[in-house]
Amino acid sequence: MANPYFQFKKFTVWHDKCAMKVGTDGVLLGAWASTERCQRILDVGTGTGLIALMLAQRSTAILDAIDIDSDACLQAQENIAKSPFANRIQVYQTSLSEYMPDENIKYDLIVSNPPYFIDSLKCPDTKRNLARHTDTLSLPDLLRDSRKLLAPEGNIALVLPFEQRESLIDIAREESLSPSREAHVSPIPDAPPKRLLIELSATPVAKPKSSHLTLEIERHRYSEEFTAIAKDFYLKM
């Protein structure tokens, strides 16, 4: 039986009630997204609350976390309540399109590990389908609705399959967003990138920063660059 929780250095993430479990994608985004000068952060599709918790650990920002699924929201609330960051994170059950923050709040950073199974066959688990498939949150909808909530100097940070890079940039351009920073993530040395970490900005950047990130140099041996961003979270680093 899979472990119902994942223990990090400063908090524990239970995922027994949530369709999508703790995984490398969420850890990557939570460790990589820039929190510099961030006062307000929005986590879209929070699931267990993992990314919100990681960003709270890395910043002094106030965070709002939203999810359309009631069980995910309950799980996130429980995980956050038991963490040292409970006073800075609020969870709301809502879709992004219907989310209306108080007092016309604008966010310095909006993060999402969005659904990305576009054409694949669906599994019998309805809640897992909701979390994995783009029926409920397409990239055009995600960027359009996030853009409305973004501060003028803010960023949108995402983790996606690498093959979606070109289509994402095209969609972003339609919303007057452009890449400011990205990392191409490979599982092992010399393997093609499997994941894309990308920050989109409403302010054009003359020379976007691009890097390559390898997760493991061999089985169960993390690379130096992944260790550098994840060591404050993983117990065995």
From Swiss-Prot:
One Pfam family here: MTS
GO BP annotation list: methylation; tRNA processing
Lineage: Bacteria, Pseudomonadati, Bacteroidota, Bacteroidia, Bacteroidales
Keywords recorded for this protein, A-Z: Cytoplasm, Methyltransferase, S-adenosyl-L-methionine, Transferase, tRNA processing
Function (record text): Specifically methylates the adenine in position 37 of tRNA(1)(Val) (anticodon cmo5UAC).
Provenance organism: Parabacteroides distasonis (strain ATCC 8503 / DSM 20701 / CIP 104284 / JCM 5825 / NCTC 11152)
Protein localization: Cytoplasm
Enzyme class: transferase
Protein name as catalogued: tRNA1(Val) (adenine(37)-N6)-methyltransferase
Major localization class: cytoplasm
